Amino acid sequence: MRQKKNDKSSEGRLTNVSGDLLVRRFSVRQPEMFRVVEMVLAKKLTSIDKAALCELAQTAMDIEFDGLDGDFLQAGCGLGGAAIVIAHAKRRSRVFTVHDLSASELAAHGADERLNVQFVPGPYEETLALDGALALVHLDCGEYGPMRVLLERLAPRLVSGGHLIVDDYRTKEECRKAVDDYFRGKKGFQLIRKSRLHVIRN
């Protein structure tokens, strides 16, 4: 396991920049997606800040640009804001599954079968598949036990270059401990602290 700052850079990508600068650049380079981000915030569909949402959208778009194999997956969606952003950032052909108890806002904002989004109701600890490649995973879970289950089932499925994003790593101690315990001593993963923690498969 290695922790380092992200030093990857290429045209169109937003790396190594402050939150405000990231938002400004994203709004210019990706105006359509930026409007989705602003809509989600205006409707109060997420507690995630604007910079983190822009970073999430850019990560999904970078994965599409790189042509990585694998599905997108989110576990825990709250009011659905982050899932809506991911759904609009990805290509329509990419399968995106959302695991949570309910997700009433997703379909209302186009994040349904029209964008190849599949909602899987129920406790995600019980509904997650144990196989299948994943290119992007977004985890919104603050408790130790459920987070360990998510990591054990999902991290091994990441493709090379895939991202597992942990929303609550900085703010919730149980989440942080679960992540640190799981990845301690594990090879093949980079832990990069951006606005959220990104775990990238080598």
Question: What does each model-found stretch correspond to?
Answer:
Residues 53-68:
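Conserved alpha-helix/loop element of class I SAM-dependent methyltransferases that forms part
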Residues 49, 53-56, 83:
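Short alpha-helical patches at coil-to-helix transitions and adjacent helical residues
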Residues 19, 23-47, 66-202:
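S-adenosylmethionine/decaboxylated-SAM
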Residues 11, 50-53, 155:
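Generic N-terminal initiation segments characterized by hydrophobic and/or small/turn-forming residues
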Residues 1-23:
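N-terminal auxiliary segments of SAM/dcSAM-dependent transferases
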